């Protein structure tokens, strides 16, 4: 199973996170399948690869709690529901 998860990078006391699609059995810093975004909590900046995120959500990937909140704030789930309606 694939999850959309935060992967920590950056310096000590200056963490930034990549939003990655990763196998559920992998470690937090393990090998990811795809980098789909970037989140900087200090400057409150977010960069998202919306088509990549939608691709993994359509394939059944589950976002973690924090990633879910980030995606919800960015409005990704409204686009996801629109894509689901078009397919059905």
Swiss-Prot record:
Swiss-Prot/TrEMBL keywords: Chloroplast, Plastid, Ribonucleoprotein, Ribosomal protein
Entry's localization field: Plastid, Chloroplast
Gene3D superfamilies from the UniProt entry: 3.30.1320.10
Any Gene Ontology CC annotation: mitochondrion
GO MF, one example: structural constituent of ribosome
InterPro entries associated with the record: Ribosomal_bS16, Ribosomal_bS16_CS, Ribosomal_bS16_dom_sf
GO BP term, pick one: mitochondrial translation
Source organism, top-level taxon: Eukaryota
Matching SUPFAM superfamilies: Ribosomal protein S16
Similarity section: Belongs to the bacterial ribosomal protein bS16 family.
Protein's recorded name: Small ribosomal subunit protein bS16c
């Amino acid at each position: 199973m694939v999850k959309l998860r935060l992967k920590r990078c950056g310096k000590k006391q200056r963490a930034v996170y990549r939003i990655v699609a990763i196998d559920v059995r992998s470690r937090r810093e393990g090998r990811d399948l795809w980098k789909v975004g970037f989140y900087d909590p200090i400057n409150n900046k977010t960069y998202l690869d919306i088509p990549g995120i939608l691709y993994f959500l359509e394939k059944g990937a589950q976002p973690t709690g924090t990633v879910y909140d980030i995606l919800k704030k960015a409005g990704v789930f409204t686009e996801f529901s629109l894509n689901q309606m078009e397919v059905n």
